[in-house]
Amino acid sequence: PPSEAPAETEQPAESAPPAESSEPAPDESAEPSVEPEVGGDGINLQNFYDSISSTYEFSSMMDMDTEIMDAYYPGLSAVSTAQFVGKIAMITASANELVLIECASSDDVAAVQAILETRKQTQVDGGAWYPESISMWESAQICVNGNYLMLVSHANAADIAAEFNALFSE
């Protein structure tokens, strides 16, 4: 028969309390800043996207991978970029699309602008398929500020374009 004496268990060794970090603790009460930063490195395009996507409805968007980029923006993946944020709707019925680019070289700006113009025109010419989508693409905005470019197809494209352009007037 099994022994009725309780099994001996080894107590875990006491560990030292964690050492105090020399780094300041994050301030949990501070609101995170979603304003794009303008600084030594210029405009942070991901911060700009985060800011507008919290203001405007960009539901069901996914990151644009190289395969999608090559299909919808031929030539864009060959451009050397300092920053790239590409978002595309997961469903074809939505015309929401956003491309934010900082070209590494000013020599590429005209080529990128032409690629963005071609995408817009392709969608307007029927690529967007649905009348509402085509209409939205007709009012899509393309902005160029130095090495920074944006294409936005959205119901609030003009407002988003104004916010993008305002980043460069500060």
Where are these regions (language model features)?
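Mature, Sec-exported extracytoplasmic domains of Gram-positive
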Residues: P1-E170
